[in-house]
Amino acid sequence: ELYRRALQMVSPCTQIREAISLIMQSRTGGALCFGQPKRLADLSEGGVEVDTAMSPQLVYELAKMDGAILLNHDGTRILSANKFLKPKATIPSTETGTRHRSAERMARQAKCIVVAISERRNTVTLYVGERKHVLDSLPTLLNRASQVLQTLVRFIDALNEALEDLSIREFQDMVTIFDVCRTVQRYERVRRISREMEPYLLELGVEGRLTSLQLQEVMMQTAGAELVVKDFYKDSLKSTSGQLLDRLAEINQEELLKLGNISQLLRYGPNPRTVATYLSSRGYRILTQTQRLTPQLIDNLVERFGSLQQILRAPKEDLVEVDGVGEVLAERIRSGLHLLQNQLALERR
């Protein structure tokens, strides 16, 4: 949470970023510390008390002095300037320069945010607790975010292809564990790539609004994909699909490439030979694609019939017996399922 807040504070078009830009242009260098006043004061000495509202121009002027500038936790007030930072020298640091070494140790000891601006290299390094991040220029950030977005679109296309194939097989009652594991694998890849966009969007701030909208638009295409886990989990689903996907997110990239690991997560065992086993879908995902059924109605249908095939075969009289389903809705469910089945068949041709 602190790291997210730090990236937002130094994103383009913020007052802190404007102050950083002014310092970089003058090539004077500097260090800005953000945190609790008492904690920062205990780990620094000397300097002058300022205690005034923060402004980029004032920070720029104060940075002309050699010492660090201390600000409150959200950077809205300047506490003091020209401070000598005195974190423990025993704290390990990978930095070589005096300013950056002190900044890294200060961030680690005080669990605060420190921005170090190099006067020679003209770079900005962000230290947040144990984390370190070198800020990129706006064009570089936009370019990297665009590359990740293009990669994401390709993976979403592959996921949608797998989902369409899975839907056809669900109607045909010919789904194998391989089909399910492949789809879940592609969905998890999409989730991981989409998460890679988050730090770029945070660092871009308002400059990343267009990229954020593009991300939201492409991710809308994956709506309902998480229900694949709910449809094919072997045992009665005591955990939510979200909890199962959280467990999937914990495995590393190499393990994700092995379908046996996904099969084991779904409780079909780790043996790769099991991927030839046929499964029957419960129908959650398909039902969400037909008429606009509420989650409760879908739960009632699955609880009553147990599988998509049983719902497809159920006469109107049986559907009406489900809690919340009347004659009109029963007919819409039947016609909606058959319409979706025909659409998938036509698209496949």
What do the predicted segments below correspond to?
Residues 224-321, 327-349:
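Long, highly charged, low-complexity intrinsically disordered interaction regions
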Residues 1-255:
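Divalent-cation
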